[in-house]
């Protein structure tokens, strides 16, 4: 019984060695553990009668379980599970990333980003923004950040937006979206905003049911959980906040972030995926519907959400995809601040 199981484990490793994606390492660790547990269970059913028969396959089962634990702890999966052939094909487009240089660049990049923030005009509602791209290995996320920044500059002027992005191809064009830079960016917004101003936080990345991916393997970043973001917002003292998250399962952020002075918009429900994160695209499906279409028709985030949701429902129905169910949660106190900001924008022809 243990010989076929070991053979299957070797086959799995062989598949991994040709490079089938950065997430395969986690799968292999789980697979090894499952194979070990399966072997233990099989011993109960198929082993020869007697103690010796039951113990015959025990070493193999324990070896698989130990291997799975060692795999998860010690093996640098992000380096191992990229195909060398695929890396060679893209070598001309991707610079060599030195982790030490990447981190040494952050203070300078972040200072330049924050120096570009202008203070708010007293008693005049204005929109400040922090935009973040979390996943370094697909260009669509940085593209969304850049294009959203361009849209906001046309609507609200320059000098009020901070951009953070993880990018394999342009690792030092913008500060990384990591925990430290995010905290500094939120505090900088809070320091420049007045009580009449609004902050837009937009995050675009992959997501799971408990976190937003901040994936940049050379930088060893940790994902952003709903609790992480809520804690950073509270620490910064940021008020009057619109939070837009374009990621799978992004609705899982709503309960933790909900507050009277916040409007929260997500691309999907907590148990649903969103779509459109392929390389070569300018926008994800939600980013396109919300920013590129709906917000060009209306300055009101709430009305734009309604318009974007209808667009997405239509696209998903046409393509036979499961519904993503975008979500919105409006705090009891943020409505008047939103209305004042949008009234000024409409009066100025925005």
Positions of predicted regions on the chain:
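Active-site-proximal C-terminal subdomain of hydrolase catalytic domains
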Residues: 21, 31-38, 242, 247-338
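A short, glycine/acidic-enriched catalytic loop
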Residues: 205-237
């Amino acid at each position: 019984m243990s010989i076929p199981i070991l053979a299957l484990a070797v086959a799995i490793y062989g598949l991994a060695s040709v490079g089938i994606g950065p997430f395969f390492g986690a799968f292999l660790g789980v697979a090894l553990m499952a194979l070990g547990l399966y072997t233990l269970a099989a011993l109960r059913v198929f082993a020869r009668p007697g103690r010796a028969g039951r113990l015959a396959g025990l070493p193999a089962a324990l070896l698989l379980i130990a291997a799975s634990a060692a795999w998860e702890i010690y093996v640098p999966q992000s380096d191992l599970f990229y195909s060398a052939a695929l890396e060679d094909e893209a070598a001309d487009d991707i610079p060599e990333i030195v982790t030490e240089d990447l981190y040494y660049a952050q203070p300078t990049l972040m200072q330049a980003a924050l120096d570009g923030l202008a203070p708010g005009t007293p008693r005049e509602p204005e929109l400040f923004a922090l935009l973040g791209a979390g996943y370094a290995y697909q260009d669509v996320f940085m593209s969304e950040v850049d294009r959203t920044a361009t849209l906001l500059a046309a609507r609200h002027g320059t000098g009020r937006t901070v951009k953070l992005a993880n990018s394999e191809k342009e690792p030092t064009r913008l500060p990384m979206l990591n925990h430290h830079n995010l905290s500094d960016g939120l505090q900088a917004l809070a320091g420049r905003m007045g009580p009449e101003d609004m902050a837009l936080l937009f995050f675009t990345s992959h997501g799971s049911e408990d976190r937003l991916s901040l994936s940049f393997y050379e930088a060893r970043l940790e994902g952003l959980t709903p609790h992480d973001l809520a804690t950073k917002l509270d620490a910064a003292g940021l008020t009057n906040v619109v939070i837009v998250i374009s990621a799978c399962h992004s609705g899982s952020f709503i309960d933790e972030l909900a507050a009277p002075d916040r409007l929260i918009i997500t691309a999907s429900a907590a148990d649903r995926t969103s779509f459109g994160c392929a390389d070569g695209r300018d926008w994800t499906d939600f980013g396109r519907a919300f920013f590129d279409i709906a917000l060009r028709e209306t300055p009101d985030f709430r009305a734009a959400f309604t318009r974007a949701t209808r667009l997405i429902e239509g696209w998903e129905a046409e393509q036979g995809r499961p519904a993503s169910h975008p979500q919105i949660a409006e705090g009891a106190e943020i409505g008047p601040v939103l209305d004042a900001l949008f009234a000024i924008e409409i009066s100025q022809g925005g």
